[in-house]
């Protein structure tokens, strides 16, 4: 009951924060030690899952992942400007075909996390992704909705809609999940367990795979952790801070080299409406070529990595 009360309190706080302009809300300064512990308890690090070896005695597992948002995140907040929507439509019309062509050239798999509405608007995308037989479809919300303000019943309804649509469109029930905007609510983890997901790829507590613990209980759910340094939108999206994709891909290379040395996992998250432009694609091409040049690199989908870890 205490945990539920805190979850409601936190959700209300987020809603109030969103309504404020210019005011910095700091509700946590008044929380008790008990409330602070409860606030962080829903999703914590459990067992580290980096194996002694990857398939084929590879040194590193590489998961290239793409969040295929397109117009969904704009539609979620009621944006209908044709100009604004056209910039997101670029992801389906141009970015995704370029990315699939690049992956075909290197014959490597990837995981595509798709808001169901994105696939509804662009029904040609899922068949194109699945054509090679190498790639995975994962859940990325219904309409790239913000989860925190939702009631649990509404969050579950949207999750079920997304699962059902993507299952029907792809012919296979997705086993991987990535939260819209990578932002869980206090209820999301419980819903993922309830609906039988194999793994999540939304959290950022480590740069290696781990089992998620919830309120002190091992969940059996595998986390393929991501990080804001390993995606392009903060740098190349609107309001981004990176002057050149070349600098961004140097960061990715250094992160990959570290994962290679540590014999663990490297997860890169990109967006077709951003990375699909000419300059980022040139650097992505060079980066994949660099990783392919190294011995002992296992390119895999999130599902392949998670199943390998599950069966250890």
Task: Please name every model-derived segment.
Residues 229-232, 264, 270-273:
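Active-site clefts of carbohydrate-active enzymes
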Residues 5-17:
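Bacterial N-terminal signal peptides
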């Amino acid at each position: 009951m205490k945990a539920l009360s805190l979850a409601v309190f936190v959700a209300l706080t987020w809603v109030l924060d969103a309504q404020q302009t210019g005011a910095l809300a700091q509700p946590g300064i008044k929380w008790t030690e008990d409330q602070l512990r409860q606030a962080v308890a829903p999703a914590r690090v459990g067992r580290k899952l980096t194996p002694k070896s990857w398939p084929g005695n590879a040194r590193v597992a590489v998961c290239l992942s793409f969040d295929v948002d397109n117009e969904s995140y704009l539609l979620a907040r009621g944006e209908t400007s044709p100009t604004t929507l056209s910039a997101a439509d670029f992801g389906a019309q141009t970015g995704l075909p370029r990315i699939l062509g690049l992956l075909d050239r290197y014959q490597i798999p990837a995981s595509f996390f798709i808001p169901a509405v994105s696939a509804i608007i662009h029904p040609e995308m899922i068949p194109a992704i699945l054509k090679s037989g190498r790639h995975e479809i994962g859940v990325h919300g219904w309409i790239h909705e913000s989860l925190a303000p939702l009631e649990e019943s509404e969050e579950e309804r949207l999750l079920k809609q997304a699962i059902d649509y993507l299952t029907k469109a792809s012919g296979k029930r997705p086993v991987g999940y990535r939260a819209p905007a990578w932002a869980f609510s206090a209820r999301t983890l419980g819903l993922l367990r309830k609906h039988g997901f194999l793994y999540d790829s939304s959290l950022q507590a480590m740069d290696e795979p781990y089992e998620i613990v919830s309120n002190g209980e091992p969940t059996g759910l595998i986390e393929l952790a991501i990080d804001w340094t390993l995606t392009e939108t903060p740098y190349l999206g609107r309001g981004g801070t990176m002057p050149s994709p070349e600098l961004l891909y140097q960061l990715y290379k250094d992160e990959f080299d570290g994962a290679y040395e540590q014999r663990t996992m490297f997860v890169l998250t990109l967006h077709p409406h951003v990375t699909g432009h000419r300059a980022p694609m040139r650097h992505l091409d060079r980066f994949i070529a660099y990783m392919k040049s190294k011995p002992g690199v296992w390119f895999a989908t999130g599902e392949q990595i998670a199943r390998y870890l599950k069966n250890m």
